[in-house]
Amino acid sequence: MKRTFQPSNRKRKNKHGFRSRMETANGRRVLAARRAKGRKRLTVSDEIPRKG
């Protein structure tokens, strides 16, 4: 049986990245809550190294 977690950075970024959080009101609420709490990384976009 295939495991349920099949990691992919693209899917991870599309679902939980900064841009996708900013798209919805609730996503912006998540960001605000994480800022208020003083999180070092707001979204997974801050963890995944970018090209360039």
Curated annotation (Swiss-Prot):
Assigned protein family: Belongs to the bacterial ribosomal protein bL34 family.
PANTHER family: LARGE RIBOSOMAL SUBUNIT PROTEIN BL34M (PTHR14503:SF4), MITOCHONDRIAL RIBOSOMAL PROTEIN 34 FAMILY MEMBER (PTHR14503)
This protein's name: Large ribosomal subunit protein bL34
Record keyword Ribosomal protein present: yes
InterPro entries listed in its UniProt record: Ribosomal_bL34, Ribosomal_bL34_CS
GO biological process: translation
GO cellular component, one term: ribosome
Coiled-coil region: none
Renumbered residue ranges of the record's region Disordered: 1-52
Feature: compositional bias, Basic residues: 1-19, 31-42
PROSITE patterns: RIBOSOMAL_L34 (PS00784)
Entries under HAMAP family matching the protein: Ribosomal_bL34 (MF_00391)
Keyword Ribosomal protein among UniProt keywords: yes
Organism: Cytophaga hutchinsonii (strain ATCC 33406 / DSM 1761 / CIP 103989 / NBRC 15051 / NCIMB 9469 / D465)
Molecular function as annotated in GO: structural constituent of ribosome
Keyword list, A-Z: Ribonucleoprotein, Ribosomal protein
Biased composition (Basic and acidic residues): 43-52
